[in-house]
Amino acid sequence: MDFALTPDQEAVREGVVALCSGFDDAYWHGCDKAHEFPHAFHKAIAEAGYLGICIPEEYGGSGLGIHDAAIMMEAISGSGAGMTGASAIHMNIFGLNPVVVFGTEEQKARFLPPLVRGEEKACFGVTEPTTGLDTTRLKTRAVRKGDKYIVDGQKVWISTAQVADRILLLARTTPLDQVSKPTEGLSLFYTKLDRDRARVVEIDKMGRAGVDSNEIFFEGYEVPAEDRIGEEGKGFRYILHGMNPERVLIGAEAIGLGRAALARAAGYAKERVVFGRPIGQNQGVQHPLAADWMALEAAWLMVQNAAWRYDQDLDCAAQANAGKYLAAEAGLKACQNAIMTHGGFGYAREYHVERYMREAMIPWIAPVSPNLILCHIAERVLGLPKSY
Protein backbone atom coordinates (compact mmCIF):
# COMPACT_ATOMS: atom_id res chain seq x y z
CA MET A 1 0.00 0.00 0.00
CA ASP A 2 1.44 3.34 -1.09
CA PHE A 3 -0.15 6.63 -0.05
CA ALA A 4 2.24 8.79 -2.07
CA LEU A 5 1.05 10.59 -5.18
CA THR A 6 2.53 9.42 -8.46
CA PRO A 7 4.83 11.79 -10.38
CA ASP A 8 1.95 12.51 -12.79
CA GLN A 9 -0.37 13.32 -9.91
CA GLU A 10 2.23 15.58 -8.30
CA ALA A 11 2.62 17.36 -11.63
CA VAL A 12 -1.14 17.81 -11.93
CA ARG A 13 -1.43 19.23 -8.44
CA GLU A 14 1.56 21.57 -8.80
CA GLY A 15 0.37 22.81 -12.19
CA VAL A 16 -3.17 23.47 -11.00
CA VAL A 17 -2.00 25.21 -7.83
CA ALA A 18 0.25 27.45 -9.93
CA LEU A 19 -2.56 28.26 -12.36
CA CYS A 20 -5.03 29.00 -9.57
CA SER A 21 -2.59 31.40 -7.93
CA GLY A 22 -3.51 33.82 -10.69
CA PHE A 23 -7.13 33.85 -9.50
CA ASP A 24 -7.21 35.13 -5.94
CA ASP A 25 -10.07 35.50 -3.47
CA ALA A 26 -10.84 38.95 -4.84
CA TYR A 27 -11.52 37.40 -8.26
CA TRP A 28 -13.91 34.82 -6.82
CA HIS A 29 -15.57 37.39 -4.59
CA GLY A 30 -16.12 39.49 -7.70
CA CYS A 31 -17.72 36.60 -9.59
CA ASP A 32 -20.02 35.94 -6.65
CA LYS A 33 -20.97 39.59 -6.19
CA ALA A 34 -21.60 40.24 -9.88
CA HIS A 35 -23.28 36.87 -10.54
CA GLU A 36 -20.73 36.45 -13.32
CA PHE A 37 -19.44 33.15 -14.72
CA PRO A 38 -15.63 32.84 -14.32
CA HIS A 39 -14.89 32.85 -18.05
CA ALA A 40 -11.24 33.82 -17.61
CA PHE A 41 -10.67 30.90 -15.25
CA HIS A 42 -12.45 28.45 -17.56
CA LYS A 43 -10.33 29.67 -20.47
CA ALA A 44 -7.10 29.31 -18.49
CA ILE A 45 -7.97 25.76 -17.41
CA ALA A 46 -8.80 24.83 -21.01
CA GLU A 47 -5.62 26.36 -22.42
CA ALA A 48 -3.55 24.46 -19.86
CA GLY A 49 -5.18 21.20 -21.02
CA TYR A 50 -6.91 20.33 -17.76
CA LEU A 51 -10.47 20.19 -19.10
CA GLY A 52 -9.59 16.96 -20.87
CA ILE A 53 -7.89 15.29 -17.93
CA CYS A 54 -10.15 12.20 -18.14
CA ILE A 55 -10.84 12.29 -21.89
CA PRO A 56 -8.94 9.71 -24.00
CA GLU A 57 -5.81 11.02 -25.68
CA GLU A 58 -7.11 10.26 -29.18
CA TYR A 59 -9.78 12.94 -28.65
CA GLY A 60 -7.39 15.57 -27.32
CA GLY A 61 -7.48 14.70 -23.64
CA SER A 62 -4.87 13.44 -21.20
CA GLY A 63 -6.39 10.00 -20.64
CA LEU A 64 -5.84 10.14 -16.88
CA GLY A 65 -8.09 8.70 -14.20
CA ILE A 66 -10.71 9.95 -11.77
CA HIS A 67 -8.09 9.92 -9.00
CA ASP A 68 -6.05 12.44 -10.98
CA ALA A 69 -9.18 14.51 -11.57
CA ALA A 70 -10.04 14.41 -7.86
CA ILE A 71 -6.59 15.76 -7.01
CA MET A 72 -7.13 18.55 -9.52
CA MET A 73 -10.59 19.47 -8.24
CA GLU A 74 -9.44 19.48 -4.60
CA ALA A 75 -6.62 21.83 -5.56
CA ILE A 76 -8.97 24.16 -7.46
CA SER A 77 -11.50 24.37 -4.65
CA GLY A 78 -8.76 24.64 -2.03
CA SER A 79 -7.21 27.63 -3.78
CA GLY A 80 -10.16 29.72 -2.63
CA ALA A 81 -12.09 29.16 -5.84
CA GLY A 82 -14.43 26.93 -3.88
CA MET A 83 -17.50 25.55 -5.58
CA THR A 84 -17.59 28.49 -7.99
CA GLY A 85 -14.30 27.46 -9.58
CA ALA A 86 -15.02 23.75 -9.30
CA SER A 87 -18.56 23.95 -10.68
CA ALA A 88 -17.39 26.03 -13.63
CA ILE A 89 -15.65 22.93 -15.00
CA HIS A 90 -17.15 20.07 -12.96
CA MET A 91 -19.50 18.75 -15.65
CA ASN A 92 -16.75 18.86 -18.28
CA ILE A 93 -14.54 16.60 -16.15
CA PHE A 94 -16.86 13.67 -15.45
CA GLY A 95 -20.09 14.33 -17.29
CA LEU A 96 -19.26 12.99 -20.73
CA ASN A 97 -18.14 9.61 -19.43
CA PRO A 98 -21.29 8.03 -20.94
CA VAL A 99 -20.27 9.47 -24.32
CA VAL A 100 -16.74 8.10 -23.94
CA VAL A 101 -18.04 4.64 -22.99
CA PHE A 102 -21.20 4.29 -25.11
CA GLY A 103 -20.88 6.86 -27.89
CA THR A 104 -20.00 5.93 -31.46
CA GLU A 105 -16.61 6.84 -32.88
CA GLU A 106 -18.30 9.57 -34.92
CA GLN A 107 -19.96 11.01 -31.82
CA LYS A 108 -16.77 10.96 -29.78
CA ALA A 109 -14.86 12.70 -32.57
CA ARG A 110 -17.65 15.28 -32.88
CA PHE A 111 -18.34 15.96 -29.22
CA LEU A 112 -15.16 15.50 -27.19
CA PRO A 113 -12.45 17.69 -28.81
CA PRO A 114 -14.48 20.95 -28.61
CA LEU A 115 -15.10 20.29 -24.93
CA VAL A 116 -11.43 19.60 -24.24
CA ARG A 117 -10.37 22.78 -26.06
CA GLY A 118 -12.86 24.85 -24.08
CA GLU A 119 -14.76 25.83 -27.22
CA GLU A 120 -17.95 24.27 -25.83
CA LYS A 121 -19.39 24.00 -22.34
CA ALA A 122 -21.77 21.26 -21.25
CA CYS A 123 -24.53 20.95 -18.67
CA PHE A 124 -26.22 17.92 -17.11
CA GLY A 125 -29.97 17.64 -17.72
CA VAL A 126 -31.39 14.92 -15.49
CA THR A 127 -33.09 16.33 -12.36
CA GLU A 128 -36.76 17.30 -12.54
CA PRO A 129 -38.88 19.31 -10.09
CA THR A 130 -41.38 16.55 -9.28
CA THR A 131 -39.11 13.50 -9.18
CA GLY A 132 -35.96 14.47 -7.27
CA LEU A 133 -33.70 11.45 -6.96
CA ASP A 134 -36.38 9.06 -8.25
CA THR A 135 -34.82 9.21 -11.71
CA THR A 136 -36.92 6.38 -13.14
CA ARG A 137 -40.02 8.58 -12.76
CA LEU A 138 -38.77 11.35 -15.05
CA LYS A 139 -41.62 12.99 -16.94
CA THR A 140 -39.70 14.68 -19.76
CA ARG A 141 -40.64 12.89 -22.98
CA ALA A 142 -38.68 12.45 -26.20
CA VAL A 143 -40.80 11.12 -29.07
CA ARG A 144 -39.13 9.85 -32.24
CA LYS A 145 -40.31 11.50 -35.46
CA GLY A 146 -38.22 10.51 -38.45
CA ASP A 147 -34.62 11.55 -37.98
CA LYS A 148 -35.29 13.59 -34.84
CA TYR A 149 -36.85 13.43 -31.39
CA ILE A 150 -39.36 15.95 -30.08
CA VAL A 151 -38.71 16.77 -26.43
CA ASP A 152 -41.29 18.15 -24.02
CA GLY A 153 -40.77 18.59 -20.30
CA GLN A 154 -38.96 20.44 -17.56
CA LYS A 155 -35.58 20.13 -15.83
CA VAL A 156 -34.39 21.84 -12.66
CA TRP A 157 -31.12 22.62 -10.88
CA ILE A 158 -29.21 22.53 -14.14
CA SER A 159 -25.85 24.19 -13.50
CA THR A 160 -24.23 26.38 -16.19
CA ALA A 161 -27.29 26.26 -18.49
CA GLN A 162 -26.96 30.03 -19.03
CA VAL A 163 -23.56 29.53 -20.68
CA ALA A 164 -23.58 25.89 -21.82
CA ASP A 165 -23.48 25.05 -25.52
CA ARG A 166 -24.69 21.46 -25.07
CA ILE A 167 -26.72 19.41 -22.65
CA LEU A 168 -26.50 15.76 -21.64
CA LEU A 169 -30.22 15.10 -21.50
CA LEU A 170 -32.08 12.13 -20.05
CA ALA A 171 -35.67 11.74 -21.23
CA ARG A 172 -38.29 9.01 -21.36
CA THR A 173 -38.78 7.58 -24.85
CA THR A 174 -41.10 4.75 -23.82
CA PRO A 175 -43.94 5.50 -21.37
CA LEU A 176 -43.50 4.04 -17.90
CA ASP A 177 -46.60 1.86 -18.23
CA GLN A 178 -45.15 0.21 -21.35
CA VAL A 179 -41.84 -1.03 -19.90
CA SER A 180 -41.16 -4.16 -17.88
CA LYS A 181 -39.20 -2.24 -15.23
CA PRO A 182 -38.87 1.50 -14.46
CA THR A 183 -35.18 1.69 -15.39
CA GLU A 184 -36.06 0.88 -19.01
CA GLY A 185 -37.40 3.30 -21.60
CA LEU A 186 -35.12 6.24 -20.72
CA SER A 187 -32.80 7.51 -23.44
CA LEU A 188 -29.71 9.68 -23.27
CA PHE A 189 -28.90 12.53 -25.66
CA TYR A 190 -25.95 14.88 -25.95
CA THR A 191 -27.23 17.76 -28.00
CA LYS A 192 -27.11 21.51 -28.53
CA LEU A 193 -28.77 23.68 -25.91
CA ASP A 194 -30.43 26.45 -27.90
CA ARG A 195 -31.74 29.09 -25.50
CA ASP A 196 -33.84 30.54 -28.30
CA ARG A 197 -35.83 27.29 -28.44
CA ALA A 198 -35.67 26.18 -24.80
CA ARG A 199 -36.61 28.54 -21.98
CA VAL A 200 -33.83 28.73 -19.39
CA VAL A 201 -34.73 30.46 -16.13
CA GLU A 202 -32.03 31.14 -13.55
CA ILE A 203 -32.71 30.23 -9.91
CA ASP A 204 -31.79 32.86 -7.32
CA LYS A 205 -29.93 30.84 -4.70
CA MET A 206 -27.94 31.01 -1.48
CA GLY A 207 -24.40 30.70 -2.80
CA ARG A 208 -22.16 30.09 -5.81
CA ALA A 209 -23.77 32.99 -7.62
CA GLY A 210 -20.97 33.01 -10.19
CA VAL A 211 -22.14 29.68 -11.59
CA ASP A 212 -25.80 29.67 -12.50
CA SER A 213 -28.43 27.06 -11.61
CA ASN A 214 -31.55 26.89 -13.72
CA GLU A 215 -34.91 25.52 -14.68
CA ILE A 216 -35.18 24.50 -18.33
CA PHE A 217 -38.51 24.24 -20.13
CA PHE A 218 -38.68 22.20 -23.34
CA GLU A 219 -41.69 22.51 -25.61
CA GLY A 220 -41.52 20.83 -29.01
CA TYR A 221 -37.71 20.93 -28.76
CA GLU A 222 -36.13 19.10 -31.69
CA VAL A 223 -33.12 16.85 -31.06
CA PRO A 224 -31.38 15.09 -33.98
CA ALA A 225 -31.51 11.31 -33.69
CA GLU A 226 -27.76 11.26 -34.34
CA ASP A 227 -27.32 12.94 -30.95
CA ARG A 228 -28.73 9.96 -29.07
CA ILE A 229 -26.05 8.14 -27.09
CA GLY A 230 -26.22 4.35 -27.35
CA GLU A 231 -29.43 2.41 -27.72
CA GLU A 232 -32.88 3.87 -27.24
CA GLY A 233 -34.27 3.01 -23.82
CA LYS A 234 -30.90 2.24 -22.20
CA GLY A 235 -30.12 5.74 -20.96
CA PHE A 236 -30.55 5.00 -17.26
CA ARG A 237 -27.83 2.37 -17.40
CA TYR A 238 -25.57 4.76 -19.29
CA ILE A 239 -26.05 7.62 -16.85
CA LEU A 240 -25.00 5.41 -13.95
CA HIS A 241 -21.46 5.45 -15.34
CA GLY A 242 -21.15 9.07 -14.30
CA MET A 243 -22.66 8.87 -10.82
CA ASN A 244 -19.78 7.41 -8.82
CA PRO A 245 -17.18 9.71 -10.42
CA GLU A 246 -19.43 12.66 -9.65
CA ARG A 247 -19.59 11.70 -5.98
CA VAL A 248 -15.80 11.37 -5.91
CA LEU A 249 -15.27 14.79 -7.45
CA ILE A 250 -17.90 16.50 -5.28
CA GLY A 251 -16.17 14.99 -2.25
CA ALA A 252 -12.79 16.27 -3.41
CA GLU A 253 -14.24 19.74 -3.95
CA ALA A 254 -15.80 19.77 -0.48
CA ILE A 255 -12.46 18.85 1.06
CA GLY A 256 -10.66 21.59 -0.84
CA LEU A 257 -13.23 24.13 0.31
CA GLY A 258 -12.95 22.94 3.91
CA ARG A 259 -9.17 23.18 3.78
CA ALA A 260 -9.37 26.72 2.40
CA ALA A 261 -11.66 27.70 5.27
CA LEU A 262 -9.42 25.98 7.82
CA ALA A 263 -6.33 27.76 6.50
CA ARG A 264 -8.05 31.14 6.82
CA ALA A 265 -9.30 30.30 10.31
CA ALA A 266 -5.87 29.19 11.52
CA GLY A 267 -4.24 32.26 10.01
CA TYR A 268 -6.74 34.58 11.65
CA ALA A 269 -6.39 32.79 15.00
CA LYS A 270 -2.65 33.42 14.95
CA GLU A 271 -3.00 37.11 14.13
CA ARG A 272 -6.06 38.18 16.12
CA VAL A 273 -4.98 39.37 19.58
CA VAL A 274 -7.56 39.69 22.37
CA PHE A 275 -6.82 40.09 26.08
CA GLY A 276 -3.15 40.40 25.25
CA ARG A 277 -2.72 37.10 23.40
CA PRO A 278 -3.61 35.46 20.08
CA ILE A 279 -7.03 33.84 20.18
CA GLY A 280 -5.41 30.75 18.70
CA GLN A 281 -3.65 30.22 22.03
CA ASN A 282 -7.00 29.28 23.56
CA GLN A 283 -8.02 25.63 23.46
CA GLY A 284 -11.60 26.66 22.77
CA VAL A 285 -10.38 28.00 19.43
CA GLN A 286 -7.67 25.40 18.79
CA HIS A 287 -9.66 22.24 19.36
CA PRO A 288 -12.44 22.74 16.79
CA LEU A 289 -9.86 23.58 14.14
CA ALA A 290 -7.75 20.55 15.04
CA ALA A 291 -10.85 18.36 14.81
CA ASP A 292 -11.63 19.85 11.41
CA TRP A 293 -8.14 18.98 10.16
CA MET A 294 -8.57 15.36 11.25
CA ALA A 295 -12.03 15.05 9.71
CA LEU A 296 -10.87 16.50 6.40
CA GLU A 297 -7.84 14.21 6.25
CA ALA A 298 -9.94 11.11 7.01
CA ALA A 299 -12.54 12.07 4.41
CA TRP A 300 -9.83 12.67 1.80
CA LEU A 301 -8.54 9.13 2.34
CA MET A 302 -12.02 7.72 1.68
CA VAL A 303 -12.47 9.87 -1.42
CA GLN A 304 -9.10 8.76 -2.78
CA ASN A 305 -9.96 5.13 -2.00
CA ALA A 306 -13.14 5.46 -4.05
CA ALA A 307 -11.27 7.16 -6.89
CA TRP A 308 -8.59 4.47 -6.92
CA ARG A 309 -11.20 1.69 -6.96
CA TYR A 310 -13.02 3.34 -9.85
CA ASP A 311 -9.82 3.63 -11.86
CA GLN A 312 -9.09 -0.05 -11.15
CA ASP A 313 -12.56 -1.06 -12.43
CA LEU A 314 -13.54 -2.24 -8.95
CA ASP A 315 -16.92 -1.67 -7.38
CA CYS A 316 -16.76 1.70 -5.62
CA ALA A 317 -20.36 2.68 -4.94
CA ALA A 318 -20.08 2.36 -1.16
CA GLN A 319 -16.74 4.17 -1.03
CA ALA A 320 -17.85 6.94 -3.41
CA ASN A 321 -21.00 7.59 -1.41
CA ALA A 322 -19.18 7.38 1.92
CA GLY A 323 -16.44 9.68 0.66
CA LYS A 324 -18.94 12.26 -0.51
CA TYR A 325 -20.81 12.05 2.81
CA LEU A 326 -17.72 12.39 5.00
CA ALA A 327 -16.19 15.12 2.85
CA ALA A 328 -19.36 17.18 2.76
CA GLU A 329 -19.82 16.92 6.53
CA ALA A 330 -16.18 17.80 7.21
CA GLY A 331 -16.12 20.63 4.68
CA LEU A 332 -19.28 22.24 6.00
CA LYS A 333 -18.13 21.97 9.62
CA ALA A 334 -14.75 23.51 8.75
CA CYS A 335 -16.51 26.44 7.09
CA GLN A 336 -18.81 26.94 10.08
CA ASN A 337 -15.87 26.88 12.48
CA ALA A 338 -13.96 29.31 10.27
CA ILE A 339 -16.78 31.81 10.68
CA MET A 340 -16.87 31.26 14.44
CA THR A 341 -13.10 31.74 14.64
CA HIS A 342 -13.45 35.08 12.89
CA GLY A 343 -16.30 36.08 15.20
CA GLY A 344 -18.33 38.97 13.84
CA PHE A 345 -15.86 39.49 11.03
CA GLY A 346 -16.71 36.01 9.77
CA TYR A 347 -20.10 37.42 8.81
CA ALA A 348 -18.48 40.07 6.63
CA ARG A 349 -17.97 39.28 2.96
CA GLU A 350 -14.47 40.78 2.87
CA TYR A 351 -13.11 37.87 4.94
CA HIS A 352 -14.43 35.30 2.42
CA VAL A 353 -15.29 32.56 4.94
CA GLU A 354 -19.02 33.38 4.75
CA ARG A 355 -18.82 32.73 0.99
CA TYR A 356 -17.12 29.44 1.68
CA MET A 357 -19.91 28.39 4.04
CA ARG A 358 -22.66 29.34 1.60
CA GLU A 359 -20.94 27.23 -1.04
CA ALA A 360 -20.28 24.33 1.36
CA MET A 361 -24.02 23.69 1.46
CA ILE A 362 -23.86 22.48 -2.15
CA PRO A 363 -21.82 19.29 -1.64
CA TRP A 364 -23.73 18.66 1.58
CA ILE A 365 -27.08 18.63 -0.25
CA ALA A 366 -26.18 17.57 -3.80
CA PRO A 367 -26.06 15.51 -5.93
CA VAL A 368 -27.47 13.11 -3.34
CA SER A 369 -28.58 13.99 0.18
CA PRO A 370 -26.70 12.66 3.23
CA ASN A 371 -29.89 10.89 4.27
CA LEU A 372 -30.05 8.83 1.10
CA ILE A 373 -26.36 8.00 1.35
CA LEU A 374 -27.03 6.54 4.80
CA CYS A 375 -29.91 4.56 3.28
CA HIS A 376 -27.59 3.29 0.54
CA ILE A 377 -24.94 2.13 3.02
CA ALA A 378 -27.55 0.53 5.28
CA GLU A 379 -29.14 -1.38 2.41
CA ARG A 380 -26.24 -2.20 0.09
CA VAL A 381 -23.41 -2.65 2.60
CA LEU A 382 -25.12 -3.79 5.80
CA GLY A 383 -27.88 -5.77 4.08
CA LEU A 384 -30.72 -4.04 5.93
CA PRO A 385 -34.22 -3.80 4.42
CA LYS A 386 -34.91 -0.95 2.01
CA SER A 387 -36.56 1.89 3.94
CA TYR A 388 -38.15 3.88 1.11
Regions found by a protein language model. Give the residues of each.
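Short Ser/Thr-interspersed hydrophobic loop/turn segments at strand-loop and sheet-helix junctions
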Residues: 49, 72-77, 171-173, 191-196, ...
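Alpha-helical interface subdomain recognition
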Residues: 1-80, 89, 102-107, 114-119, ...
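A short, Trp-centered hydrophobic/proline-enriched beta-strand micro-motif
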Residues: 118-126, 170
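Helix-loop "lid/cap" segments that line or gate small-molecule binding pockets
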Residues: 92-102
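A short core secondary-structure module
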Residues: 147-148, 152-199
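Active-site-adjacent elements of ketosynthase-type condensing enzymes
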Residues: 129-139
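Flexible, small-/acidic-enriched active-site or ligand-binding loops
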Residues: 137, 194-222
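Long, acidic (Asp/Glu-rich), low-complexity accessory segments flanking structured domains
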Residues: 220-238
